[in-house]
Design a protein with these regions (language model features):
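N-terminal export signals
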Residues: 2, 8-30
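Short, well-ordered beta-strand elements
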Residues: 40-52, 78
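A bilobed periplasmic-binding-protein/Venus flytrap-type ligand-binding module shared by bacterial periplasmic
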Residues: 48, 126-144
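Short, polar/charged alpha-helical segment
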Residues: 55-71
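Short helices/loops that flank or line small-molecule/ion binding pockets
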Residues: 60, 83-98
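Short helix-initiation/N-cap motifs at beta->coil->alpha
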Residues: 71, 76-88
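A ligand-binding cleft/hinge motif common to bilobed small-molecule-binding domains
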Residues: 95-116
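An extracytoplasmic/periplasmic, membrane-proximal ligand-sensing/linker region
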Residues: 157-194
C-alpha cells in the first residue's frame, strides 16, 4: 500500500469509526436521573399543578409553613403543567406528595376521565381542607407522613385542616397521618436508618 492509499484508508477508517462511535456515545450520554433521585431525597417536594391555581396557592401556603417549622426538610412546591403530569409523576413514584382538588383526587383514584392511563395509583389521603387534599403514595415512610401531618395540624384551625380518619374520596388514610391526628407517639428512626 503506498503512502497516499494508506492515508486515504486511515482517514476513511477514522471517519467510519467516528460515525459509529459518536451516535453511540450520544445515546449513552450522562443521564440526569441520578441527580434527580438525589434531589428528591434531599427536598420534601409537594406537587401542584399550574392548571389548578387554587391548589397551587394552597401548596405554597402549606410548604411555607413546613419550611418555617421544618427548615431541614427543604420543602418546596414542584409545579406540573397539568393534572395528567401530576398523575404520571405519582404513578411512576417520581413524587410522593401532591395537592389535589376533591374532583381530581376522585378521578385519579378511580381512573376517571383523563386519568384512565394512570389507574390504579397507590395513594392515601393525609389532610383535607374542604376543597383540596394532600395525598401521598402508599410507600411514603410512616415517619415522614407523621411529621408533615403533625406540623401542618399545628395550624389546623386557620388552614381548615383535618385528617379524614376513615379515609375519603376512595382513599384510606395514611397510617402516619392517622398517628399524628390521634396524637400517638411514633418512634422516629435514627439518623443512620433514615
Amino acid at each position: 500500500m503506498n503512502l497516499m492509499n494508506r492515508r486515504t484508508w486511515l482517514l476513511s477508517a477514522a471517519s467510519l469509526a467516528a460515525a459509529l462511535v459518536v451516535p453511540f456515545r450520544a445515546a449513552h450520554a450522562h443521564s440526569p436521573y441520578r441527580q434527580w433521585d438525589i434531589f428528591r431525597k434531599k427536598h420534601l417536594q409537594i406537587l401542584t399543578s399550574r392548571s389548578d391555581l387554587e391548589g397551587d396557592s394552597i401548596g405554597d401556603e402549606w410548604v411555607a409553613l413546613l419550611l418555617e417549622r421544618l427548615p431541614l426538610s427543604q420543602a418546596m412546591v414542584s409545579r406540573a403543567r397539568d393534572m395528567r403530569r401530576v398523575a404520571s409523576l405519582l404513578k411512576t413514584d417520581q413524587a410522593k406528595l401532591a395537592v389535589l382538588s376533591h374532583s381530581d383526587a376522585k378521578a385519579m383514584i378511580s381512573g376517571g376521565a383523563g386519568f384512565e392511563d394512570y389507574s390504579p395509583i397507590p395513594l392515601q389521603i393525609m389532610l383535607d381542607n374542604g376543597t383540596h387534599v394532600l395525598v401521598a403514595r402508599e410507600n411514603l415512610p410512616l415517619h415522614h407522613a407523621y411529621v408533615v401531618t403533625a406540623t401542618l395540624l399545628e395550624e389546623a384551625r386557620p388552614l381548615h385542616l383535618r385528617v379524614p380518619l376513615d379515609g375519603q374520596l376512595g382513599m384510606s388514610v395514611h397510617p402516619g397521618a392517622r398517628s399524628a391526628a390521634l396524637g400517638e407517639a411514633l418512634e422516629m428512626p435514627s439518623a443512620e436508618a433514615a
